[in-house]
Amino acid sequence: MASQTIEILVEGGKATPGPPLGPAIGPLGINMMQVVEEINKKTADFGGMKVPVKITADMDTKDFEISIGTPPTTALVLDELGIESGSHEPGTEVAADFSVEQAFKVARMKFDDLLANDYKHATKEVIGTCVSMGINVQGKDGRETQKDIDNGDYDDVFTQ
């Protein structure tokens, strides 16, 4: 069984046979509309976010499997905040303020893809992403909030 795998980012629920999907899967000879419909069905909950999609096609039978990853942490943070982008000058310009609870929510969504062994450290990873995006956490620089988490200031959030 010869198979080929394509990995691509598509907008949740809005995949089309056009670029970038069409040119990537067209040469595989699989039914493009079936692929598009299945991707849209599986990514509908991630509307407006870029979602990693992995398409594995059997070159002999033209069957395919689609697996959906979770959107990048940045996309989940932006979606949670309801904004379109982070700061253009992180460190000097603040784009928004994020709460530890929101960071925890994103950490739960991304947990399997993160390096952390527990939700507390996963939340700190998400907060690190916020720092690079110019997003404050709890009204201050995310690095300070990470120290507060280490000091146990937000332990009640992680026991929910």
From Swiss-Prot:
Comp. bias intervals (Basic and acidic residues): 141-150
Function: Forms part of the ribosomal stalk which helps the ribosome interact with GTP-bound translation factors.
Pfam families from the UniProt entry: Ribosomal_L11, Ribosomal_L11_N
Family the entry assigns: Belongs to the universal ribosomal protein uL11 family.
Region: Disordered, residue numbers: 141-160
UniProt record, GO biological process: translation
A single cellular component GO annotation: large ribosomal subunit
PROSITE patterns: RIBOSOMAL_L11 (PS00359)
Protein's gene: rpl11
Organism: Methanosphaera stadtmanae (strain ATCC 43021 / DSM 3091 / JCM 11832 / MCB-3)
Keywords attached to this entry: Ribonucleoprotein, Ribosomal protein, RNA-binding, rRNA-binding
Single GO term (MF): large ribosomal subunit rRNA binding
Biased composition (Acidic residues): 151-160
Keyword check for Transcription: no
Keyword rRNA-binding on entry: yes
Protein's name according to its UniProt entry: Large ribosomal subunit protein uL11
Coiled-coil spans in chain: none
